[in-house]
């Protein structure tokens, strides 16, 4: 599917989609327990992959209107009867590979071509340290993966600068081992707010986990030396239900659209405070000069169009915001410098290179370095760009189309179903001229 975006103004009120990060963790947490009702989850390609994994390990999932009813495997996952296909979901693979280390037999996990190119070696090594069998079939640290146990817990050392999802998977599995897991970080943790999301979900399901060290910032996991989770714990949310909050990663495109092209104002509802690092999009827009207000009590963010100026911003903890910031920089005055972004190259695609390439196709000058992307603002041309089979690339380029000087066509735009299936419909509701099809 291609998407054709006509330069447009936007106006209106929309609701933030449910958080993909929280939904993944809630589905798996319910799987580790007796089960739970996950209320207001994100139903998307990625989260369905996690639901399939829970089913493969012996649980069940069933959609009931806007909720997901999960019956769990009560801390004892069964050996899957078939290969677990994680599709394009790196979160599913990393979280449920650790689950595989708890089975008596072996679990095999694979995914699409993009996922089979992403690094899993540090997680496999960590599971090996715990006594699991954990292998890449191609012996290159990439899927397909073979993993089995069953582990009792123990101590391990792992890098913190490749993916925080390794830590999440280990903590979630460690809570149902016999002796728990002690995690030592051998490098500084990147994407620390995502581990905070994990800690929040664990606590909501009655599971205690501890941060070792830390720098006493609002982000509990920032500067951590490691983590500890005791074994023998049970997953059980209060009243058997868990409510998924709104997704600030997805909100970033709506807020950017309002800052660049609001005729009057754009209001995003469902923006309640949580552990999500991507809530930083609000302060980033403020630093660029946006007219934006966040009523945290009501969970509503209001943004109006204004002239933006370039900024320097690090994305060590907010890698998913890089595409949005790059587009904002292209439309702003001056230079926008995005730093601490080497790990953003390890997502569904190399997002640093992809954004540099596609913005240049739209007439925007960029400089790309190993750990930095510089975008020179001043205007965006119309043209045809590639979506790189990456939902965040597609959605950010759609925002660019609002203020381009001609139509922007995004090839292979259907990957929005990974995190924001109704994205183009939501843009249309705000007044965007958008057509999708061949």
From Swiss-Prot:
Single annotated GO MF: 3-phosphoshikimate 1-carboxyvinyltransferase activity
UniProt subcellular location: Cytoplasm
Q: Which InterPro entries match?
A: Enolpyruvate_Tfrase_dom, Enolpyruvate_Tfrase_sf, EPSP_synthase, EPSP_synthase_CS, RNA3'P_cycl/enolpyr_Trfase_a/b
| Entry annotated with the keyword Repeat | no
Q: What Pfam families is this protein classified in?
A: EPSP_synthase (PF00275)
**Domain of life per record:** Archaea
Instruction: Recite the UniProt keywords alphabetically.
Output: Amino-acid biosynthesis, Aromatic amino acid biosynthesis, Cytoplasm, Transferase
Q: To which protein family does this belong?
A: Belongs to the EPSP synthase family.
Official protein name in the record: 3-phosphoshikimate 1-carboxyvinyltransferase
Organism, as annotated: Natronomonas pharaonis (strain ATCC 35678 / DSM 2160 / CIP 103997 / JCM 8858 / NBRC 14720 / NCIMB 2260 / Gabara)
Q: Which gene encodes it?
A: aroA
């Amino acid at each position: 599917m291609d998407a054709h975006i006509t330069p447009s103004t936007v106006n209106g009120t929309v609701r933030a989609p449910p958080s993909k990060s929280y939904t993944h963790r809630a589905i798996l947490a319910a799987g580790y327990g007796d089960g739970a009702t996950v209320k207001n989850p994100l139903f998307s390609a990625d989260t369905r992959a996690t639901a399939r994994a829970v089913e493969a390990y012996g649980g069940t999932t069933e959609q009931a209107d806007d909720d997901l009813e999960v019956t769990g495997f009560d801390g004892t996952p069964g050996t899957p009867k078939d290969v677990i296909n994680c599709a394009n979901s790196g979160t599913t693979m990393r979280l449920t590979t650790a689950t595989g280390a708890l089975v008596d037999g072996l679990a095999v996990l694979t995914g699409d071509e993009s996922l089979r190119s992403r690094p899993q070696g540090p997680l496999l090594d960590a599971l090996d340290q715990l006594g699991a069998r954990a292998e890449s079939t191609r012996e290159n640290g990439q899927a397909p993966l073979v993993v089995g146990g069953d582990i009792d817990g123990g101590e391990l050392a792992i890098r913190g600068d490749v993916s925080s999802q390794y830590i999440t998977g280990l903590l979630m599995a460690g809570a149902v081992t016999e002796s728990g897991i002690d995690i030592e970080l051998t490098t500084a943790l990147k994407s620390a707010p995502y581990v905070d999301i994990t800690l929040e979900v664990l606590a909501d399901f009655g599971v205690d986990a501890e941060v070792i060290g830390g720098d006493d910032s609002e982000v509990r996991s920032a500067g951590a030396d490691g983590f500890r989770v005791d074994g023998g714990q049970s997953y059980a949310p209060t009243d058997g239900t868990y409510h998924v909050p709104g997704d600030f990663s997805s909100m970033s495109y709506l807020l950017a659209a309002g800052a660049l092209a609001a005729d009057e104002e754009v209001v995003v509802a469902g923006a309640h405070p949580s552990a999500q690092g991507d809530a930083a999009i609000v302060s980033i827009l403020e630093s660029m000069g946006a007219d934006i207000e966040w009523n945290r009590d009501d969970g509503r963010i209001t943004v109006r169009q204004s002239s933006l100026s370039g900024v320097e911003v690090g994305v060590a903890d907010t890698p998913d915001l890089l595409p949005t910031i790059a587009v904002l920089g292209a439309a702003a005055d001056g230079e926008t410098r995005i730093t601490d972004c080497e790990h953003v190259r390890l997502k569904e695609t190399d997002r640093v290179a992809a954004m540099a390439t596609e913005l240049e196709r739209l007439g925007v000058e960029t400089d790309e370095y190993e750990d930095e992307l510089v975008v020179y603002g001043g205007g965006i041309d119309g043209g045809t760009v590639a979506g790189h089979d990456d939902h965040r690339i597609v959605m950010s380029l759609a925002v660019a189309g609002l203020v381009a000087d001609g139509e922007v066509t995004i090839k292979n735009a259907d990957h929005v179903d990974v995190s924001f299936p109704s994205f183009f419909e939501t843009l249309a509701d705000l007044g965007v001229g958008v057509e999708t099809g061949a």
